[in-house]
């Protein structure tokens, strides 16, 4: 028989940097989850993704056990790293802060497509390009 799910927690945590301090500790503590056990498991699973914020969905069961799924880093993090910038433009229509090539967009799509709402690479590239433009980044051929 399947375990009874009592909660689902969605967080974004820096890879390899999960610790009991907020926001992780309070979110897990409210559900009665062993915080250190989660932190160790999360840090181990994300050791090859250092430098990114990782979205994680934690499913908590009635016996206080848990499972979690890590997703790919947000598209904006991947875009910023590819463009070599730390933040997007404050006014993307007037200020351009960097540029990406179609090849760089396709690299991002290859990493991110598993978490996107399309499986078509062409459509996914349009989504990523739109995100880049809204950050003040020019997409060039």
From Swiss-Prot:
One or more lysine residues are methylated. Forms part of the ribosomal stalk which helps the ribosome interact with GTP-bound translation factors. It holds the Pfam family Ribosomal_L11_N. This is Large ribosomal subunit protein uL11. PANTHER family: 60S RIBOSOMAL PROTEIN L12, LARGE RIBOSOMAL SUBUNIT PROTEIN UL11M. CDD domains: Ribosomal_L11. The gene is rplK. GO terms for biological process: translation. Keywords: Methylation, Ribonucleoprotein, Ribosomal protein, RNA-binding, rRNA-binding. Part of the ribosomal stalk of the 50S ribosomal subunit. Interacts with L10 and the large rRNA to form the base of the stalk. L10 forms an elongated spine to which L12 dimers bind in a sequential fashion forming a multimeric L10(L12)X complex. Belongs to the universal ribosomal protein uL11 family. GO terms for cellular component: cytosolic large ribosomal subunit. InterPro entries: Ribosomal_uL11, Ribosomal_uL11_bac-typ, Ribosomal_uL11_C, Ribosomal_uL11_C_sf, Ribosomal_uL11_CS, Ribosomal_uL11_N, Ribosomal_uL11_N_sf. GO terms for molecular function: large ribosomal subunit rRNA binding; structural constituent of ribosome.
């Amino acid at each position: 028989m399947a375990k009874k799910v009592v909660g689902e927690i969605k967080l974004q945590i820096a890879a390899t940097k999960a610790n009991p301090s907020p926001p992780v500790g309070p979110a897990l503590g409210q559900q009665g989850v062993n915080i250190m056990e989660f932190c160790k498991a999360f840090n181990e699973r994300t050791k090859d993704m250092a430098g990114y914020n990782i979205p994680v969905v934690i499913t908590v069961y009635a016996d206080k056990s848990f499972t979690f799924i890590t997703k790919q880093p947000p598209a904006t993090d991947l875009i910023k790293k590819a463009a070599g910038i730390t933040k997007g433009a404050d006014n993307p229509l007037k200020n351009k802060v960097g540029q990406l090539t179609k090849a760089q967009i396709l690299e991002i799509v290859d990493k991110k497509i598993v978490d996107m709402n399309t499986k078509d690479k062409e459509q996914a590239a349009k989504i990523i390009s739109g995100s880049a433009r809204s950050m003040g980044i020019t997409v060039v051929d």
